[in-house]
Amino acid sequence: MPTVNQLIRKPRQANVKRNKVPALQENPQKRGVCTRVYTTTPKKPNSALRKVAKIRLTNGFEVIGYIPGEGHNLQEHSVVMIRGGRVKDLPGVRYHIIRGVLDTQGVKNRKQRRSKYGAKRPK
């Protein structure tokens, strides 16, 4: 434990919290345009072809966003909305594309957790 004199010489430093989603600039969502839509493979224990898109945001940031759900209609120049939230087994993917908003269609034939995938209530 430091002495009073030591604390006067060098005060305690506040713990600096690093922002996990800097491209959002404290906003809940941001709009952007897809510059490239492709698949990538996850880290070691997992195996799949995960669908991701490189997105140029309205604030000039270029980020990689994950496309959740089965099947999608995204291509280059699609306008999308992103939210924060990383994908644990894809390095560098710190954002999710919101389904059912702007050019992104909702997931077809989705019965449960529909709001997360932009699916309308089945008749």
From Swiss-Prot:
Single Gene Ontology MF annotation: structural constituent of ribosome
Keywords: Methylation, Ribonucleoprotein, Ribosomal protein, RNA-binding, rRNA-binding, tRNA-binding
Stored InterPro entries: NA-bd_OB-fold, Ribosomal_uS12, Ribosomal_uS12_bac
This protein's record includes keyword Transmembrane helix: no
Pfam families: Ribosom_S12_S23
Disulfide-bonded cysteines: none
Coiled-coil stretches: none
Listed GO CC annotations: small ribosomal subunit
Positions carrying 3-methylthioaspartic acid: 89
Domain of life: Bacteria
SUPFAM superfamilies associated with the record: Nucleic acid-binding proteins (SSF50249)
Gene Ontology biological-process entries: translation
Family: Belongs to the universal ribosomal protein uS12 family.
Quaternary organization: Part of the 30S ribosomal subunit. Contacts proteins S8 and S17. May interact with IF1 in the 30S initiation complex.
NCBIfam families reported in the protein's UniProt record: rpsL_bact
Protein's job: With S4 and S5 plays an important role in translational accuracy.
Protein name: Small ribosomal subunit protein uS12
Record organism: Rhizobium leguminosarum bv. trifolii (strain WSM2304)
